[in-house]
Amino acid sequence: PYRRQRQMCIRDRYYVIAPVILITTFVISMFLFIYTLLRRWFKAGRTASVAVGTVLTFAALQFTYKPSDSFYWYNGAIYYTFFFSLMLFLFTSVITIIKSENTAARVICSVLSMPLAFMIGGGNYATALFTSIILVLLTAWQIKHKDKSFIILAVITVLSLVSLGISVMAPGNAIRQASVGAGPGVLKALVYSFAYGAYNIADSTTFPVAVMWIALLPVFYRIAVSSGLKFRFPAAAIIFFYCVYCAQGTPVFYAQGIHMPYRMMNIIYFAYYGFMTISLIYLSLIHI
């Protein structure tokens, strides 16, 4: 008994490492993703990219729904928050592959992206599905624009989809599904996803967060101007972004109905900041 108690004491003593790992990876990945998105995709200035990345990362960390489930509960958070952070690292690498003119940077990011995509595909279904959807869309975009980077993107996408497929077909899923009962079906899961997406956006836009977005609007407008991008169908694009955003909730609603754990709610909340940033910049482009 003494030996077992001693082992538990040692384990608890080192448990403090968990939030350090989870918070550090989240902060770094969130900042790098926002910075790279603005700097490379929208051609924003370095100062604006750093400022927006810092503000959004701080807000996402500060106003997390349930910090205990995202950063302090290792067993739950490592499978959700940590994998979400890996997804952001992957998207940062993919943007670099598409937009960077530095061959070495593109090669390094390509090498890093392949194992990352395979690993994420085998993680929680929300992040795995969302990642695969984004990768498919980016690959299609590159094919349409006849960019040679579509080849490596296609490889990364296939790795993500194969990993997700293996995860879905794993025998343990049937056992787990039997223990929670039958889900509501595909149609209801989609309805729940769209409803929760709207609720999540409204609930996440608290007064301080709304003030933050208003304060960032002039910055987003300048970024939109510097990007040189133009879009002809703003309403359709925002609806499309919203559909992709809502897809995160579909796996859990399909499997468990309307019961969503906080750790799942947290990663959808984190994605809210990326969705709002892209949408607000896009809306700024309408008048240019």
Model segments located where?
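Transmembrane alpha-helix segments characteristic
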Residues: 52-59, 153-160, 228-254
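Membrane-interface micro-motifs in multi-pass membrane enzymes
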Residues: 48-95, 124, 246-281
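Transmembrane-helix motifs of polytopic, lipid-linked glycan transferases
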Residues: 21-47, 51, 89
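Membrane-interface alpha helices of multi-pass inner-membrane proteins
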Residues: 107-136
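Short hydrophobic alpha-helices at membrane interfaces in multi-pass membrane enzymes
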Residues: 96-118, 148, 154-155
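Hydrophobic, aromatic-rich transmembrane alpha-helices
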Residues: 29-33, 206-232
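Perimembrane helix-loop-helix junctions
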Residues: 130-160
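Single conserved hydrophobic/aromatic residue that forms the stacking wall/gate
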Residues: 1-6, 10, 286-287
